[in-house]
From Swiss-Prot:
Lineage per the UniProt record: Bacteria, Bacillati, Cyanobacteriota, Cyanophyceae, Oscillatoriophycideae
Oligomer and partners: The gas vesicle shell is 2 nm thick and consists of a single layer of this protein. It forms helical ribs nearly perpendicular to the long axis of the vesicle.
Underlying gene: gvpA
Protein name as catalogued: Gas vesicle protein A
Any one Gene Ontology molecular-function term assigned to this protein's record: structural molecule activity
Organism per entry: Microcystis sp. (strain BC 84/1)
Pfam family name, one: Gas_vesicle
Entries under InterPro entries matching the protein: Gas-vesicle_GvpA-like (IPR000638), Gas_vesicle_GvpA (IPR047870), GvpA (IPR050530), GvpA-like_CS (IPR018493)
Region (Alpha helix 2): 51-70
Region Beta turn: start-end pairs: 35-37
């Protein structure tokens, strides 16, 4: 299988459009300790997607039915 190299580059708008279309999840975790004593722990999960992408995901995993039944 050969790898093709292209000289075309993506613009920032194309990259943002692709991220919003597909969605991206950033999961971060950090811990600060001193002499074995934990001073600070940070956990973060950031989800970036368009509303349409999120609604497709929510429907696929059944989140929209739970919200409709609660109302």
């Amino acid at each position: 299988m050969a790898v093709e190299k292209t000289n075309s580059s993506s613009s920032l708008a194309e990259v943002i459009d692709r991220i919003l279309d597909k969605g991206i999840v950033i999961d971060a975790w950090a811990r600060v300790s001193l002499v074995g004593i934990e001073l600070l722990a940070i956990e973060a999960r950031v989800v970036i997607a368009s509303v349409e992408t999120y609604l497709k995901y929510a429907e696929a995993v059944g989140l929209t039915q739970x919200a409709x039944x609660a109302x």
